[in-house]
């Protein structure tokens, strides 16, 4: 979920507190028995439903259903989840890989890592199904709700009982931002928007276990003309991941990302466009139950001398555009989040008081959208919600858009700066 780099980020000022898997743990993106794949969508769904029914009846399904509905606790009975991509530290930090003290500290964080790895495996399985099934002609509501239902099923938390969503489920709403819209768009109730053949759609969603949020995103485009745009952003994100590490300055990461991104260009309808970094969108660190932890990872060169630190978790995300490379708020807001340590403002509207109670009990500081309030049976809440926003208790996240007619793309991964290695926790075979 993108962090906006300008006055919006300063306005947020979000703050939060922020051994190894067994050698025979399965590789990232695979279940213990391996994923069953089939080129036939009909066969997949039929077999998948049978697998899901078997799991529900105690049959102990060992493959994921299609669509994904089998809880990971069924697939990984030993509760040891796949590691992400392990990257050894380089240069002055290379000693950390073999340092016994650092390895010991790393082993002490096994519960923390298992929660992150479980959330990451949920994300991998859900997104890999989504990548195979998202097609032109689908409504955005159908796509978003399908992804969200899968995440809830795999985490084992439907989020309909008070406090259940705080234990696991959606880390933030499924963003489906199309073409010039770069981030923070998800359909509200009644939205009839349909995905088109020529669209470029960013799919950005989070899965969490106990507030350990895995934030990862990819871009869907059906026309190969956009391939260079997607390649630029994927390269830039991987460059940011490569450069990130303990004691690395944010400014150095941003400079490397920009150099990678802006070495690409894309030809659309006979016109050549340079791929530009969207300079006011950033990556960010992640704290427990808080998606934007207060530190920003720029995607352009600049003067931020803040350093990454041991034990921190970061979402490394980059955005490329054929437009101005700058986004502004536009369109109807759908994303919201309770501001951590918000000021205690007396609320005069009973609807605002009641809604704040619902938010605290069901989402805490996790982002939510209007559809999630609808799902909980809330109605006529918009006046109260706007009052919470104007009172500085809830932050709104309007869609962020470049100029109309432009195309934007996004790729994102979550990394954990472990004491002895860097783990790209959300890495998969897909990206």
Swiss-Prot record:
The keyword Glycosyltransferase does not apply. A divalent metal cation 1 binds at residues 204, 215, 412. Residues 35-47 have a biased composition (Acidic residues). It catalyses: Release of N-terminal amino acids, preferentially methionine, from peptides and arylamides. The keyword Protein transport does not apply. Binds 2 divalent metal cations per subunit. Has a high-affinity and a low affinity metal-binding site. The true nature of the physiological cofactor is under debate. The enzyme is active with cobalt, zinc, manganese or divalent iron ions. Most likely, methionine aminopeptidases function as mononuclear Fe(2+)-metalloproteases under physiological conditions, and the catalytically relevant metal-binding site has been assigned to the histidine-containing high-affinity site. SUPFAM superfamilies: Creatinase/aminopeptidase, Winged helix' DNA-binding domain. Its EC number is 3.4.11.18. Residues 1-76 are annotated as: Disordered. It is found in: Cytoplasm. Keywords: Aminopeptidase, Cytoplasm, Hydrolase, Metal-binding, Protease. Cotranslationally removes the N-terminal methionine from nascent proteins. The N-terminal methionine is often cleaved when the second residue in the primary sequence is small and uncharged (Met-Ala-, Cys, Gly, Pro, Ser, Thr, or Val). Belongs to the peptidase M24A family. Methionine aminopeptidase eukaryotic type 2 subfamily. This is Methionine aminopeptidase 2-2.
